[in-house]
Design a protein with these regions (language model features):
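Short, hydrophobic/aliphatic alpha-helical segments
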Residues: 6, 33-34, 145, 206
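Short pre-active-site segment immediately N-terminal to the catalytic Zn-binding motif
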Residues: 2-20
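Catalytic zinc-binding patch centered on the HExxH motif and its immediate surroundings
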Residues: 1-2, 153
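Short coil/turn segments at secondary-structure junctions
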Residues: 7-10, 39, 88, 154
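Catalytic or ion-translocation cores adjacent to nucleophile or general acid/base/metal-coordination motifs
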Residues: 2-4, 30-69
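C-terminal, non-catalytic "cap/extension" segments appended to globular domains
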Residues: 16-20, 27-28, 46, 54-58, ...
Length: 251
């Protein structure tokens, strides 16, 4: 059965990846639609966002070439580093920001951050985790956290942070199911029935089990960890270590 998604889009890579991401949500819905309503949700808040992003991890240059959407990329270290740098700007740069949002919210809820210091505390966290500072002087007359929709909407943000961790765990497990033997960043599970069946076995559980049990069905582990991210970005890590040798990095 086909599904439909209505959106305003342009014929570019960003919108193509958005389609894959949104279809990840849709097929998650379809797999758990026969469960009791109480269980028709992701195993935890991070799962739903991670599903679509896991699919996107398989949209590799080789996969796009197979579809005839891009020309063949001549294998080279430069090409790998360029692609990894692009992915890191999306996947790694987000992580500290994803942590800042809810850490600030939780400290507001606990009273550790008081109304008189909302903005000061916001920028202290931004500087601590992201190494960024306001471009112009800010005071408590400003409310910069409110510029992020999820803050005034009181929408938890940890789901996105967690999704950026577990999507790489999912991808690694699916690549193993598909029998892929190369570097993790080159793996595309498209066309693998074995990977699809392994994925579906987890998706159809919805929220019917503790999330640890659901994760174990796919990954074989009951914990969230960043080992798969480190493996995925190993080429970039090695390159950055070379480029920054003898330098002190940080803020």
């Amino acid at each position: 059965n086909g599904v439909r998604s209505r959106m305003c889009m342009q014929p570019n890579e960003e919108d193509l990846c958005t389609i894959y991401h949104e279809l990840g949500h849709v097929y998650y819905y379809l797999w758990y639609k026969d469960l009791p309503p109480l269980f028709q949700n992701g195993a935890h808040d991070g799962f739903h966002e991670a599903i679509g992003d896991t699919v996107n991890l398989s949209v590799t240059p080789q996969y796009l070439h197979g579809l005839g959407l891009v020309s063949a990329v001549k294998p080279s270290r430069e090409a790998v580093i360029n692609q990894q740098m692009k992915m890191a700007s999306e996947k790694i740069a987000f992580l500290p920001f994803g942590k800042v949002i809810d850490e600030w919210r939780w400290k507001v809820f606990s009273g550790e951050i008081t109304p008189a210091h909302y903005n000061e505390a916001w920028w202290k966290l931004r500087t601590q985790y992201q190494g960024v500072a306001p471009p112009v002087p800010r005071t408590e007359a400003d409310f910069d956290p409110g510029s992020k929709y999820h803050v005034p909407a009181n929408t938890p943000y940890t789901r996105y942070f967690l999704s950026f961790i577990i999507q790489f765990q999912f991808q690694k497990a699916l690549c193993e199911a598909a029998g892929f033997k190369g570097p993790l960043h080159e793996c595309s599970i498209f066309g693998s029935k074995a990977a699809g069946e392994r994925f579906a076995a987890m998706l159809k559980l919805g929220q019917s089990e503790p999330w640890q049990d659901t994760m174990e069905k796919l990954t074989g582990t009951r914990q969230m960890d960043a080992a798969a991210i480190l493996e995925y970005f190993q080429p970039l890590q090695a390159w950055l270590a070379e480029q920054s040798k003898g330098q002190t990095c940080g803020w």
